[in-house]
């Protein structure tokens, strides 16, 4: 079979803005306004209006905007509203870890039966959704928890539940996500208590002897999250001793700089912690630190990530020999990977990270939930034809009911899922060092920010991306203002074009960079971006020569009829689950999902012109603005394939391991429908190829 596309990851680090790829002058506009294509914006200055890295930290190409700057719309707002009305918004009524009775986060002595990572895991997303949607109930609840944590800080600066490990060392892991909650709260409220709170805590951390600092498994792996908060505070206060603490954290965190190994292979740790060297690179300026993060990403995917969807197989840990697309990843892992991608996009300016963030967000993350976001599952795989409460080990690493959609189970993911979409929204637009704006993750909505010489503008974005290739922007400004607008061109996109007020602007836009429009903008100016989407077949040579099918940023899965069977959420849960005694179980059922149609098909693919093997069918946009379901999918593909009788559910109750392609089968040719992977709760996304 002819090779269709190489899949081994091979990329280089982009350190500086690339040369101008195209240059033109806008017709009818004076002062030589320009349109250029660059690999990334220059970072020789600092944004005048939004908090950027202070020296000696590396200058940033992109700067995160305040929470209040971005208002999501369209499908993205719909996901947040579903979360608000679903498990995220009501987990405080369900989870025993969020009870306000005997909770160590609420007690001055910081002791209680309940109190560890669960509260901050949930609150960092719950609170941010409250800020973005301006939901009064959620805002009030968020403030309750934030006030309690601040008020219970100890005189020496320590805070949070007192948890000691067997060797008597204080476990600091749970404080790390709580610091992120504090940062978001400060961005929203400007409550000065937060800066004092964090400064006192970091002075306390700095005084801990190294042999007692970040020694336990979780905190040792995840020290980079602590470092993010240290730099956040440094950029607001400029206190130099904070840089000493960052160095201390780096020295005591697990070694994520190994050339051909990782300190551990836990899926969430890898997705969350591989960025630690790149975080410290901002201070060290050592190119090896930045390279280590890229190498970690490449390593895990070359071994366990030769699958579609942007993630890798580690259920819960990656294991030698378990690299088939039936291997799954935690919902936590998806959230942390997207978060890492967003951080790395800011600090490196490399569009590679935006591409991977979209891959996870569009093709993997939505499928971890029921369509109403009232239940989720712990593990999701690219090839997954049963989602039930049975024990599927050792086919997956974990023992227990890890595949069912259950609002009462999946303790860590049950809480940590909350931040996925809202962090995505917060990073959809970013400020630039030259006082411009960059649109990074296309979705409907609006951004309000200061640009140019301090003029506050609002840009409204209209699009059905990633289900449509056109993105329209309208600029609202009180007076004319000159600033650069950066439009990201994804790596999959060839032939991107842009127009201003209906006039096409010539620019040689290449995949993986930015169109930079510098103009003297006036109120009502319109910019239209087109990102032509094409069919592409990707071959996974290292995974049995299987293939996946992309259309633009979307990967497609076989449309499998899904039979949802409602079950009691309390009858089959993971061993560490817990719920409040008065949680209304009738409102929060669990679901097993079984295939109600055949799934064991291989695709017929034209090896010379693989894209000709599929037909794109475009459908109406869903009235409820939720495209991530099979029924609502705005795009489908029509393909042809054959059934493979020997490819069945195996002895562990899982989708069987892929057969090696090409597969010979005497079955008849069958018309197949493929749907976007992110809306398919049961899915075959890595297909065998049949002859």
Short names for language-model regions:
Residues 493-519, 537-542:
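Solvent-exposed beta-strand/loop surfaces of large extracellular or lumenal domains
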Residues 483-486, 517-534:
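C-terminal beta-strand-rich structural cap/linker in extracellular carbohydrate-active enzymes
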Residues 1-36:
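Bacterial Sec-dependent N-terminal signal peptides
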Residues 35-45, 293, 355-363, 368, ...:
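C-terminal beta-rich recognition modules with glycine/proline-rich loops and embedded aromatic residues
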Residues 34-136, 168-188, 192, 224-241, ...:
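Aromatic (Trp/Tyr) and acidic
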Residues 164-172, 179, 194-221:
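Asp-box/WD-like beta-propeller blade repeats and closely related beta-sheet repeat scaffolds
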Residues 209, 213-257, 262-263:
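Solenoidal tandem-repeat scaffolds enriched in leucines and small polar residues
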Residues 122, 136-173, 304-312:
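Helix-terminus loop motifs that line ligand-binding clefts
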């Amino acid at each position: 079979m002819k090779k269709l596309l190489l899949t081994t990851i091979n990329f280089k680090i982009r350190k500086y803005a690339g040369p101008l790829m195209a240059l033109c002058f806008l017709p009818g506009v004076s002062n030589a306004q320009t349109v250029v294509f660059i690999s990334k914006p220059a970072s020789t200055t600092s944004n005048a209006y939004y908090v950027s890295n202070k020296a000696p930290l590396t200058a940033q190409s992109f700067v995160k905007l305040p929470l209040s700057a971005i208002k999501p719309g369209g499908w993205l707002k719909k996901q947040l509203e579903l979360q608000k009305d679903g498990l995220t918004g009501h987990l405080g009524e369900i989870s025993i870890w969020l009870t306000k009775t005997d909770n160590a986060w609420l007690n001055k002595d910081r002791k209680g039966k309940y109190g560890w990572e669960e509260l901050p895991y949930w609150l960092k997303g719950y609170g941010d959704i409250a800020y973005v949607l301006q939901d009064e109930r959620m805002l009030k609840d968020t403030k309750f928890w934030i006030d309690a944590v601040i008020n219970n800080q100890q005189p020496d600066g320590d805070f949070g539940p007192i948890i000691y490990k067997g060797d008597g060392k204080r476990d600091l892991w749970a404080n790390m996500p709580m610091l992120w909650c504090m940062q978001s709260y400060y961005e929203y409220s400007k409550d000065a208590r937060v800066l004092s709170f964090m400064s006192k805590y970091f002075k306390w951390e700095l005084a801990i002897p190294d042999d007692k600092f970040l020694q336990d498994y979780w905190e040792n792996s995840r020290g980079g999250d602590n470092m993010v908060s240290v730099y956040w505070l440094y950029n607001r206060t400029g206190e130099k001793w904070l840089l000493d603490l960052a160095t201390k954290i780096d020295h005591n965190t697990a070694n994520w700089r190994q050339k051909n190994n990782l300190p551990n292979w836990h899926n969430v740790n890898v997705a969350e912690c591989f960025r630690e060297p790149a975080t410290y690179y901002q201070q060290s300026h050592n190119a090896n630190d930045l390279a280590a993060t890229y190498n970690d990403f490449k390593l895990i995917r070359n071994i366990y990530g030769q699958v579609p969807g942007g993630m890798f197989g580690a259920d819960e840990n990656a294991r030698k020999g378990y690299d088939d697309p039936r291997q799954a990843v935690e919902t936590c892992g998806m959230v942390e990977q997207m978060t890492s991608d967003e951080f790395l996009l800011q600090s490196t300016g490399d569009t590679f990270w935006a591409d991977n963030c979209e891959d996870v967000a569009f093709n993997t993350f939505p499928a971890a939930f029921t369509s109403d976001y009232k239940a989720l599952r712990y593990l999701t795989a690219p090839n997954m034809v049963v989602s039930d409460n049975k024990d599927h080990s050792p086919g997956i690493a974990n023992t227990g009911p890890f595949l069912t959609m259950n609002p009462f189970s999946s303790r860590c993911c049950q809480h940590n899922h909350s931040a996925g979409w809202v962090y995505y929204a917060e990073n959809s637009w970013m400020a630039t060092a030259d006082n411009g704006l960059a649109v990074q993750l296309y979705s409907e909505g609006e951004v309000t920010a200061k640009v140019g010489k301090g003029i506050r503008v609002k840009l409204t974005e209209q699009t059905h991306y990633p289900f449509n290739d056109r993105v329209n922007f309208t600029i609202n400004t009180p007076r004319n203002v000159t600033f650069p607008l950066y439009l990201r061109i994804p790596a999959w996109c060839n032939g991107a074009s842009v127009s201003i007020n209906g006039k096409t602007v010539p620019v040689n836009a290449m995949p993986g960079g930015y169109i930079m429009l510098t103009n003297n903008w006036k109120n009502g100016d319109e910019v239209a971006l087109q990102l032509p989407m094409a069919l592409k077949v990707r071959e996974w040579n290292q995974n049995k020569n299987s293939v996946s099918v992309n259309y633009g940023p979307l990967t497609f899965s076989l449309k499998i009829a899904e039979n949802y069977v409602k079950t009691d959420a309390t009858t089959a849960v993971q061993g560490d689950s817990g719920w409040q005694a008065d949680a209304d179980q009738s409102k929060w059922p669990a679901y097993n999902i079984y295939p109600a149609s055949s799934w064991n098909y291989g695709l017929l693919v034209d090896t010379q012109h693989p894209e000709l093997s599929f037909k794109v069918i475009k459908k109406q946009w869903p009235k409820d603005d939720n495209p991530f379901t099979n029924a609502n999918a705005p795009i489908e593909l029509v393909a042809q394939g054959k059934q493979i009788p020997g490819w069945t559910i195996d002895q562990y109750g899982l989708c069987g391991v892929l057969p090696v392609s090409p597969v010979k089968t005497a079955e008849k040719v069958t018309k197949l429908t493929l749907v976007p992977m992110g809306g398919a709760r049961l899915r075959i996304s890595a297909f065998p190829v049949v002859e």
